[in-house]
Amino acid sequence: MAAEIHSRPQSSRPVLLSKIEGHQDAVTAALLIPKEDGVITASEDRTIRVWLKRDSGQYWPSIYHTMASPCSAMAYHHDSRRIFVGQDNGAVMEFHVSEDFNKMNFIKTYPAHQNRVTAIIFSLATEWVISTGHDKCVSWMCTRSGNMLGRHFFSSWASCLQYDFDTQYAFVGDYSGQITLLKLEQSTCSVITTLKGHEGSIACLWWDPIQRLLFSGASDNSVIMWDIGGRKGRTLLLQGHHDRVQALCYLQLTRQLVSCSSDGGIAVWNMDVSREEAPQWLESDSCQKCEQPFFWNIKQMWDTKTLGLRQHHCRKCGQAVCGKCSSKRSSYPVMGFEFQVRVCDSCYDSIKDEDRTSLATFHEGKHNISHMSMDVARGLMVTCGTDRVVKIWDMTPVVGCSLATGFSPH
């Protein structure tokens, strides 16, 4: 079922501790059980499984429960030991797990959506289960009565969800690339604002309530940090992945952001440095360096008897430039560009060697990651994906051992 991996500790990369195999289809969610050597998984094969580590070092399923429909999302509340499972048919089911994690009792079914559930969050304070789905809505239901309290519709599939428990603000990402901030009430909600910055569908969100930072990952392979608490509209772009960003986790104590992409890439971003905002791209009818006309500027082309050029943009200054004036490439990590991007010649000359020093580390998960979660207190990470494999990682060599007071590495 599961193999214990004996990796030689390396100071620079995550250490693979265990590999769990046995699912018959893609694993859509995997969550580490706090203070236990255990993992809860949900899969397209219609099963919920609780895996516990045995004396042999291997993980074996102590609970194996088959659902009526493929499992598409999951939330686990450890203090009350409640599991909420979203399904492909739109229903959310609640279970209660025994103290020894060997038995799981069905509590109730919530008719939350008309289509596939994409994300679930449980709020104990309000006794709400909040969820998003492919029926283009976010819904919140009362866990005491099982009744629908409210619902808000979007123009496209709602793909991911984060929630601020103190203010009852919900952040919903959708397939159009937009993030909507909602204030949820007992039976109504109000739209506070919408955030637009990605060029692809939003795949994941992470909310840090302490610094009031929202992180979003999308199919445009990029991560954006939205400084909600700063109230100045500040955003930071992070580009280092080569595929869709599927999962995020911000480590507040060490000011690091962990992101995973569908090609197996794992990135750890240093957010404890002074980063610069990427500029807005400027528009012009001619190159802002050599003043040659762009191809749609017919008048200047006629007047100067020259051929029009393609418009490009310098990633550092944002100016509209021609290919000749932006022939060089450079990384510029302080602005989030971890690999080489187009810059104009004058900006290239202004970038020093030390400016190219990476502010992130990149690692290989070696499987298609669709979901990731972390036990920050122990420095553990679990990844799962379309290859039906669940991997448990020791992240302390990468993020450090000081994540929690009294924590010591394995």
UniProtKB/Swiss-Prot annotation:
Keywords: Endosome, Metal-binding, Phosphoprotein, Repeat, WD repeat, Zinc, Zinc-finger. The modification Phosphoserine is found at S408. WD repeats lie at residues 22-61, 66-105, 112-150, 153-192, 197-236, 240-279, 364-403. It comes from the Eukaryota. One of its GO terms (molecular function) is zinc ion binding. InterPro entries: G-protein_beta_WD-40_rep, WD40/YVTN_repeat-like_dom_sf, WD40_repeat_CS, WD40_repeat_dom_sf, WD40_rpt, WDFY1/WDFY2, WDFY1_FYVE, Znf_FYVE. A zinc finger (FYVE-type) spans 281-352. One of its GO terms (cellular component) is nucleolus. PROSITE patterns: WD_REPEATS_1, WD_REPEATS_2, WD_REPEATS_REGION, ZF_FYVE. Zn(2+) 1 binds at C287, C290, C322, C325. SMART domains: FYVE (SM00064), WD40 (SM00320). It is found in: Early endosome. It holds the Pfam family WD40. SUPFAM superfamilies: FYVE/PHD zinc finger (SSF57903), WD40 repeat-like (SSF50978). One of its GO terms (biological process) is positive regulation of toll-like receptor 4 signaling pathway. Zn(2+) 2 binds at C314, C317, C344, C347. The keyword Cytoplasm does not apply. Positively regulates TLR3- and TLR4-mediated signaling pathways by bridging the interaction between TLR3 or TLR4 and TICAM1. Promotes TLR3/4 ligand-induced activation of transcription factors IRF3 and NF-kappa-B, as well as the production of IFN-beta and inflammatory cytokines. The FYVE-type zinc finger domain mediates interactions with phosphatidylinositol 3-phosphate in membranes of early endosomes and penetrates bilayers. The FYVE domain insertion into PtdIns(3)P-enriched membranes is substantially increased in acidic conditions. The FYVE domain is required for its function in regulating TLR3 signaling. Binds PtdIns3P in vitro with high specificity over other phosphoinositides. Interacts (via WD repeat 2) with tyrosine-phosphorylated TLR3 (via TIR domain) in response to poly(I:C). Interacts with TLR4 in response to LPS. Interacts with TICAM1 in response to poly(I:C). PANTHER family: LD41958P (PTHR46189), WD REPEAT AND FYVE DOMAIN-CONTAINING PROTEIN 1 (PTHR46189:SF2). This is WD repeat and FYVE domain-containing protein 1. It comes from Bos taurus (Bovine).
